[in-house]
């Protein structure tokens, strides 16, 4: 990550804190930008400028970080609604459709986003794209016994897919749910995210894929202009 990208992430994480109000049940996203937001939230709670916040983590990593910062937490299964969810994304298209799952947390992230009254996405400007999947591969979480079957189904759709391998252990990445991840690339990108999301999720052995369709309410984009970081707020037309 470049210094400029870090500046953009910090700026947008700070902007996101302004969305949080006392007493909220808050979906805590995963990834580097969300982690910066969680750290800032911990500071606000410690100094007393925010109060009575309950966080619902979307990953084990986020749960550990929030716990270390003293943020009160509640499991997803223990809540019926979430006031606000704030999370990052790997790609955002002009219609606010997303690809998420670079950290293999997209199952929990989508659960939290789906019951949130508002879902705000925080990204730096490098994540804004005209079309999904031309650069970033689409993660698909699969049951371990089914990954080859799902890979064949994806190949039949015209996609190329690879089993995501771990960097600091022998073998594949294992998700918080104990599953594997296929990273999927369509040569011409994804033209119809809504249809593809449903199509992939209908394959036997698929738990969830990283397309987030019609969930996002607002996108906060960190930018650098004339060497100064700023935040651009994008809202649905």
Curated annotation (Swiss-Prot):
One of its GO terms (cellular component) is cytosol. InterPro entries: NagB/RpiA_transferase-like, Ribose5P_isomerase_typA_subgr, Ribose5P_isomerase_type_A. Its EC number is 5.3.1.6. One of its GO terms (molecular function) is ribose-5-phosphate isomerase activity. It catalyses: aldehydo-D-ribose 5-phosphate = D-ribulose 5-phosphate. CDD domains: RPI_A. It is an enzyme of class 5 (isomerase). The keyword Ion transport does not apply. Pathway: Carbohydrate degradation; pentose phosphate pathway; D-ribose 5-phosphate from D-ribulose 5-phosphate (non-oxidative stage): step 1/1. Keywords: Isomerase. GO terms for biological process: D-ribose metabolic process; pentose-phosphate shunt, non-oxidative branch. The active site is at 109 (proton acceptor). Substrate binds at residues 30-33, 87-90, 100-103, 127. PANTHER family: RIBOSE-5-PHOSPHATE ISOMERASE (PTHR11934:SF0). Catalyzes the reversible conversion of ribose-5-phosphate to ribulose 5-phosphate. Homodimer. Belongs to the ribose 5-phosphate isomerase family. This is Ribose-5-phosphate isomerase A. The lineage of its organism: Bacteria, Bacillati, Cyanobacteriota, Cyanophyceae, Synechococcales.
């Amino acid at each position: 990550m470049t210094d400029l990208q870090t500046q953009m992430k910090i700026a947008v994480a700070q902007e996101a804190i302004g969305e949080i109000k006392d007493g909220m049940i808050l979906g805590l996203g995963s990834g580097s930008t969300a982690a910066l937001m969680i750290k800032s939230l911990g500071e606000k709670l410690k100094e007393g400028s925010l109060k009575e916040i309950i966080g619902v983590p979307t990953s084990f990593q986020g749960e550990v970080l929030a716990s270390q910062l003293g943020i009160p937490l509640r499991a997803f299964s223990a809540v019926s609604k979430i006031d606000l969810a704030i999370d990052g994304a790997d790609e955002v298209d002009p219609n606010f459709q997303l690809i998420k799952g670079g950290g293999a947390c997209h199952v929990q992230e989508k659960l939290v986003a789906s019951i949130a009254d508002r879902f705000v996405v925080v990204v730096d400007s490098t994540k804004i794209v005209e079309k999904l999947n031309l650069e970033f591969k689409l993660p698909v979480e699969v049951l371990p016994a089914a990954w080859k079957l799902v890979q064949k189904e994806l190949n039949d759709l015209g996609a190329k897919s690879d089993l995501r391998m771990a960097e600091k252990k022998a073998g594949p990445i294992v998700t918080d749910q104990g599953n594997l991840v296929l990273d999927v690339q369509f040569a011409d990108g994804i033209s119809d995210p809504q249809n593809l999301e449903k199509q992939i999720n209908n394959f036997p052995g698929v738990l969830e894929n990283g397309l987030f369709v019609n969930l996002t309410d607002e996108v906060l984009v960190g930018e650098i202009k004339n060497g100064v970081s700023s935040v651009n707020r994008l809202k649905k037309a």
